[in-house]
Structures are given as C-alpha cells and as structure tokens.
Amino acid sequence: MSELNQGCCAGHADGAGEAAEHGCCSHEAAGAAGAGAAKPAFVADGVNVAVVGATGQVGRVMCAMLDQRDFPVKSLRLFSSVRSAGSVVTWRGQDITVEDVAKADLSGIDVAIFSAGATASREYAPKFAAAGAVVVDNSSAWRMDPTKKLVIPEINADVLTAEDKIIANPNCSTIQMLVALAPLRKFGIKRIVVSTYQSITGTGVKAVKQLENCLIY
C-alpha cells in the first residue's frame, strides 16, 4: 500500500520512494489561472474524476494538470493509502478530503487516473473498472498485458472503444520518442538508436532526498 503515495515521474509511477505526505495540488498549479475572476471549481455537465495516489508527486501533478488544462470536472475525488487518508488537498479553492482507497465506495466515478505504482494499480484498477470507471494508468502494471491497450493519444487514440476500461500509459521516454517518430513511419524506419537520461524522481521521493545530500554547495 505504500506505493499509493510514492513520488515519481509520470512515466515511472512505480517509484520506490516514500510518500510525499499532505501534498496540495493547488501548489503545483499556482498562477495557472492567471488574473481575473476565479474559474468555477466544478461544472454541471463535466466528468466525475478520481485521482488515485493523489498525495504523491505524480498525483499532485495530475491534479494540477486538470486545473491548468481546464478539464471539465463535475466532481473530484482523491484517493491514497490509509497513511494519507483524511488529509485535505485544496483544488481550485475547494478543500477535498483524501479517501482511503481500500475502504471507499467507488461508485459514480467516470474516469480514474492512477498514479499509485504498479502493485496498487494491479489491485485497485480492476475494482474501479468494475464499478464503472474508465481507468488511465500511469504505472507499468498493464503495459505488457495483451488484453490492455497501450495508448499515446496523439498517435493511436482511435484504437479505444467503449469496452476498454483500463488504459495503459507508456513509459515517459517512449511517449516523447514516439510522438516525434510517428510521422516518419511513412518513410520506413529500419533502426532507431536511442540514448535517454532518466529523472531521479523515477526512483521515488527518497531518492530525491538522497540526491540533495550529494549536491555541492
């Protein structure tokens, strides 16, 4: 269950670090709304959204992106392990209490964004799907599962159907590379040589703290 709060980059939601406790999504989205009147937190004709792993690094960024991209949210529910359950996250000026994913009623959710690590995704994603939600999973749990579709929206979103209840999100390096390479397929690609530099956050919050001890001041 500790994976529910582990921090990592969006393509590596399997981080082995400790939880970023009591995170606030609104901190990540500071200034995104710009000047003028505040946008409404929720819209009547929007989508009922859940973020699983909401107090971790990736979960907080997911909350921020929902705000920054003006996603039409009808309701927002935040889930974590029992360790962070009960904490309060502020999103668009609204205080939202984080729920214990192991005990919560999962009904009424349209889309569930999982940023909780592979173990948590394997355990809880099917339960969210069975309750009626479409799950978008950031971990490696379903990437190699032949029954699940691995989707990069800019490339192959058209493969999705109403029957797809758990959608796998590729590794972050894969996404960046294929968005650039997809238009070149028509020319015929024989071989690709790739060098990547991975973020330390892919290992988790603990690794970030360890790196700080190695920096020269």
State what each model feature region is.
Residues 2-12, 22-217:
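N-terminal Rossmann-like NAD(P) cofactor-binding subdomain of oxidoreductases
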